[in-house]
């Protein structure tokens, strides 16, 4: 017992030294050109153009012809979702897609919010911009940039947007009313893909900051999960004076000695300040962290090394694309869903919503360019980029959803984000928080903003 206390004290001192030695710094606000060829000498067109999602008979006919040629491989007996997407259940998804899914209707739903495009650093950047339909007298909306990840899209935010822009209508307090901007990451959906290597999270952060500046916002809130959390973190590192607050539902934590402490075992976790909830979500460590990450990260290695190879198959087969993406909406929502024949997909999502997200990738042909984002960010390894070792000095809030792929205790998060003012253990939910639990996430964003406004 005494030896454990001494070791914990020594480790605590090492952590304190490691945490306190970093200085406040910012990422440089540089410039870039990601369009084809050399950057033209003429000034870039900064106009903001309305945009509508469209489809055609030819597009739908081609989709149906490809679906009709789907060739299934029978699953192993009792394999459920342990080998990936179960092809027996995939047949049900394909039948629904071919015979019941109405893409024209979903296009109308996509167009319920105003879409726009604007040129930034040589790329046509797509975004939706939703203003409040009503405001309390004398109040102005709070601008909020929300950034998606992979394999999601701007569509992930469609159910949370009205809770933020029109809270009173949906039974929520109108103390905070938001004006929401949801861009598509370059190379995702309707945002143009880069013609050049190197467009990573930092470049995307700069592009999105320029977007907010072009829209006239000098100070704003930002929110993200998955890649969106890293992009938003980079924005806060780049222009902290323009960010009123940063809210995350996932964190990229590297160069953080605290993230190694669970290896010391559950008893040391208590000495180091982990809560009972942290211990529940981290242990047994081998199963809940090590094995789970090993099971769920195969795609990451492929996409961080040779994304174009697997992309060729996915860009040619809509059913292959659906299986590849929808498998993530199963096990990333709850790892236990791999025990189910249908992967638990319809427990939290409708097939219409899931296939709408797939169609955004399919109709734009952006699965390859979206996968390249892994190569640009991880292709050189981890802990090689400047931003990975930098702290974030803006007010930060964090929603810890219990079924996230890797739980990040408050102790970990606070090392990277010293101004963490709100950390919430969420009641339920996994990786796709806005898509799965929009009300819970909206409530936590509002709670965080209430605290951030007091800073």
Curated annotation (Swiss-Prot):
UniProt activity-regulation remark: Inhibited by 10-hydroxystearamide and methoxy-arachidonyl fluorophosphate.
GO cellular component, one term: endoplasmic reticulum membrane
Residues recorded with modification Dimethylated arginine: 295
UniProt-listed Pfam families: EHN
One GO molecular-function entry: oxysterol binding
Modified residues (N6-acetyllysine): 439
Entry keywords, A to Z: Acetylation, Aromatic hydrocarbons catabolism, Detoxification, Endoplasmic reticulum, Hydrolase, Lipid metabolism, Membrane, Methylation, Microsome, Transmembrane, Transmembrane helix
Annotated EC: 3.3.2.9
Enzyme class: hydrolase
Major place of residence: membrane
PANTHER family in UniProt: EPOXIDE HYDROLASE 1, EPOXIDE HYDROLASE 1-RELATED
Membership in a protein family: Belongs to the peptidase S33 family.
Name of the protein described by the UniProt record: Epoxide hydrolase 1
Organism per entry: Mus musculus
